[in-house]
Amino acid sequence: MARLAELYNKEMVPALMKDQNYKNIMEVPKLVKIVVNMGLGEAIQNVKILDSAAEELAAITGQRPVITKAKKSIAGFKLRQGMPIGCAVTLRRDKMYEFLDRLVSVSLPRVRDFKGISGKAFDGKGNYSLGVKEQLIFPEIDYDKVDKIKGLNITIVTTAKTDAEGKALLKLMGLPFRN
């Protein structure tokens, strides 16, 4: 079992039950999944960019990404329906906890001028989205082998009903919020 999962079961659940006044252990919010997405508009001209991005995403998450395709054609972007335009990975269970642990303890501190993450990026239902400007903050990525700096989106899905519950859970998990 992942270190963060054990910590959640042994320490975070009782702390959340006490803080939020939950009567049943099933009311306590928990992580459902983490979706890591890399959108690549440049993949329209050069498909090789997509292959390198998929390799990097696999190294970061430890799981093979799925190639995302365009849902509809947009003439202004020279985009046709079904063209590959990105890649995404959905992490669950132990891999999810291990990824979050590495993100909080290793990757986020490597961001230049890091002062914490915004507490306003919740969606109203307790889920949190985070944008990373460059994939180089992850220790799995070798700086010399990177041909182009790419950003990625990380969405943390929880069972929390409100943003306050979700923020309390993620704060206990170690996410460094600014406010």
Swiss-Prot record:
Gene Ontology, cellular component aspect: ribonucleoprotein complex; ribosome
A GO BP annotation: translation
GO molecular function: rRNA binding; structural constituent of ribosome; tRNA binding
Keywords per UniProt: Ribonucleoprotein, Ribosomal protein, RNA-binding, rRNA-binding, tRNA-binding
Quaternary structure and partners: Part of the 50S ribosomal subunit; part of the 5S rRNA/L5/L18/L25 subcomplex. Contacts the 5S rRNA and the P site tRNA. Forms a bridge to the 30S subunit in the 70S ribosome.
Function: This is one of the proteins that bind and probably mediate the attachment of the 5S RNA into the large ribosomal subunit, where it forms part of the central protuberance. In the 70S ribosome it contacts protein S13 of the 30S subunit (bridge B1b), connecting the 2 subunits; this bridge is implicated in subunit movement. Contacts the P site tRNA; the 5S rRNA and some of its associated proteins might help stabilize positioning of ribosome-bound tRNAs.
Homology family: Belongs to the universal ribosomal protein uL5 family.
The protein's name: Large ribosomal subunit protein uL5
